[in-house]
Amino acid sequence: MGMRSAARMPKLTRRSRILIMIALGVIVLLLAGPRLIDAYVDWLWFGELGYRSVFTTMLATRIVVCLVAGVVVGGIVFGGLALAYRTRPVFVPDADNDPVARYRAVVLARLRLVGIGIPAAIGLLAGIVAQSYWARIQLFLHGGDFGVRDPQFGRDLGFYAFELPFYRLMLSYMLVSVFLAFVANLVAHYIFGGIRLSGRTGALSRSARVQLVSLVGVLVLLKAVAYWLDRYELLSHTRGGKPFTGAGYTDINAVLPAKLILMAIALICAAAVFSAIALRDLRIPAIGLVLLLLSSLIVGAGWPLIVEQISVKPNAAQKESEYISRSITATRQAYGLTSDVVTYRNYSGDSPATAEQVAADRATTSNIRLLDPTIVSPAFTQFQQGKNFYYFPDQLSIDRYLDRNGNLRDYVVAARELNPDRLIDNQRDWINRHTVYTHGNGFIASPANTVRGIANDPNQNGGYPEFLVNVVGANGTVVSDGPAPLDQPRIYFGPVISNTSADYAIVGRNGDDREYDYETNIDTKRYTYTGSGGVPLGGWLARSVFAAKFAERNFLFSNVIGSNSKILFNRDPAQRVEAVAPWLTTDSAVYPAIVNKRLVWIVDGYTTLDNYPYSELTSLSSATADSNEVAFNRLVPDKKVSYIRNSVKATVDAYDGTVTLYQQDEKDPVLKAWMQVFPGTVKPKSDIAPELAEHLRYPEDLFKVQRMLLAKYHVNDPVTFFSTSDFWDVPLDPNPTASSYQPPYYIVAKNIAKDDNSASYQLISAMNRFKRDYLAAYISASSDPATYGNLTVLTIPGQVNGPKLANNAITTDPAVSQDLGVIGRDNQNRIRWGNLLTLPVAQGGLLYVEPVYASPGASDAASSYPRLIRVAMMYNDKVGYGPTVRDALTGLFGPGAGATATGIAPTEAAVPPSPAANPPPPASGPQPPPVTAAPPVPVGAVTLSPAKVAALQEIQAAIGAARDAQKKGDFAAYGSALQRLDEAITKFNDAG
């Protein structure tokens, strides 16, 4: 029967076409509009920072990759459709009610839409996905050699880092493209009659057979290429149940030959498939494909399984020995743990020490860190916040400076940033939020080895940090009483101010000064930002774009925006670095430092790979998750790496946001490749000023990754490695409130890298024996410019108490538990244990130091300000304990042991420093006059009567009320609080 006339699609009216076009236009605008706005804003932002070349390079690469991938994939699919259409049968017999006829009619009626639209849509999708691999393509184009060859194939490691990922990407796209072309060709032949399923056997036209068979043959050829590339990827493969990474005995002797055999079979099958074109017999390619499938099961999976079970497992240690050695060598190379970086020394850990020997360790005993940066933030807030909208992070930072005597000291440091979330009432108005409250004010540093007085001295500030402040003073001049001079203490960029939604500030001269700056006893002083940073906001185009970006109409209508206005946004230091260097992974800890009289944020940047041959694949989130990261919810994003380098040190100016990248690792091939992709963006290491080098520190995240790997890869013998008997463990944090690994600690102590008594700034960690609580090693990473990056590992034999056992011994000591029981009795004070430091002292000894804090009440509320009350120590199973370091050392080693320990900082009893002598942060309201001595924190076995306990609680409440009134500038409430304080002290003195 002849073919029926095709049913035509109903035609759309002109009005319907217009409505459809409008609807499509709206959809495109909704989808593309925000992205175009973001792209334009990024173009402005990168240009303002001086990194527009980064933006244009990324954009151009993405566009080119998208177009090329889209054209190639779409073109291959289009070719499959076009060939099927051009070679369709001239006459197609049609049975009654044939459903294919209806589809054929629809396709013929919209032939261009189907023939071009489907490949275009597939190509567009492929291009969008492909552009996300722009970095892989750039590394392929610019990557070089490592100068190290893999032990199996003898290829330079640059092949695995830069070339192999690109080849695998291209192969994946070709497989997908050809498969989609096969599907498109198959469907098109079916619709146009080249394939007919009617009747008993159906029919297949010659053109359909040739095209489909050819596409299948190409797929098989591509599979052969995949088998070839699989050989190289074996070197980064981990077989289940093995304690090492990389190709083992089974992989080299079974899987690798199997890949070659399968590749040969695939080539034979491809030839068989192509032969069907001439032989016109589809049974041959069918047999070939079945053979390939069976071969992959028998040769590719079955044979390696037999070798593993019969040959390897019974003799695993000997069989895998060579490959374990490869993994040890490669992992050490990939993570910077080679012999030129890591020095191992034997250390007894339990040698006896005399008072004279301990006192001679001046670099350690004079720098014992008492301030825990995870605990003292509330004290910073209490004494240095000044205004409700200023804020300090929950975890403060550690840095080092020279004190007034030229001695190296570590300090707990913090920038007093603006926290927009703490604005209240009218302060939250858009104008106030974005044009008045724009910046923080001040750099606060506290010597980490001392406090402002003994806690049971008769003054209200005993046990609290001593604050050194750089701040804009009450007369508008900069007061630099900090550890280093600072010209500009105003802070427009920082992690606190950026940790809010819509973290932008509108600055610049537009009439009178508008930004809140500081207060005097008379009025509030204003300020206008004068920095070079910021995107101009004066033009109507810019105002419209930012109004759309932030969904805020005030950009268009507010008169606070003038021709000189700028907008500051993207103010997080780490995110700014990641934006201008998208190839970097940044450290989770960003810290402020004064460098050349400027306040900068220092950010550590890493280059990483995930396919370094024979190197262990490590999860950054797991390796860096210590108790601090868990407690402060600061876990890094999950990313697996097998190679890492701290290749870049970056600074972000806290005032104008300038980002500067410095080359830290001059040998890193990955960094060299990126420096070719983005020339001129990274400054050479020689440009690092000495003042900056003095504040660069060994990064925490890298150290935590390295210590976890050193737990295994310090072992040299492959047989011992396989048995895991000599592995170490990262100790758990012994603090009862912690639930993860003990964090490493920055300290100033004697120089272990040089093995002398000079003071050195270092990052340290204890290591336990495998699955035990005894010490196995002590790791120190030097941050001194001369020895930066050197790791020193003290290996400890015998059974020396680890952190958990030391903490248990201290907390259960009768004198300690009795004293703290009295202090915390009836919930008068909440006891908190600080960081447990492990310090090498004397010749072969290890001293544990643990500060003890107390805060009023039993809760952990924000109004509870912990202060140092005791110092606990342990040395060789003996516990020392007292109000000061000297007392604890004397209790451990005898008189004279604390002779070189830093004493408590002198403090005028109960009188806070005056603004002229040592200015506190700007604050409204009265300054407290001399206060009658508050009762001391109980020491020893002291029993308080219920009346005295009640009076103490009234005293604490009155002091809190006075401080609140001082912040608010409420003189009446302040006077009332002082009266309550006097009455409470009288009650305490009169109580029996």
Swiss-Prot record:
Leader sequence residues? none
Q: Which InterPro entries match?
A: UPF0182 (IPR005372)
Transmembrane residue ranges: 18-38, 63-83, 113-133, 175-195, 210-230, 259-279, 287-307
What superkingdom heads the lineage? Bacteria
Query: Where are the compositionally biased (Pro residues) regions?
Result: 912-938
Membrane topology is: Multi-pass membrane protein
Q: Where is this region: Disordered?
A: 906-938
One Pfam family this sequence matches: UPF0182
A single GO cellular-component term from the record reads: plasma membrane
Ordered alphabetically, the record's keywords are: Cell membrane, Membrane, Transmembrane, Transmembrane helix
UniProt main location, coarse: membrane
Localisation per UniProt entry: Cell membrane
UniProt lists the family membership as follows: Belongs to the UPF0182 family.
PANTHER family reported for this sequence: UPF0182 PROTEIN SLL1060 (PTHR39344:SF1)
Which NCBIfam families does the entry mention? PRK00068.1, PRK12438.1
Protein known as: UPF0182 protein BCG_3215c
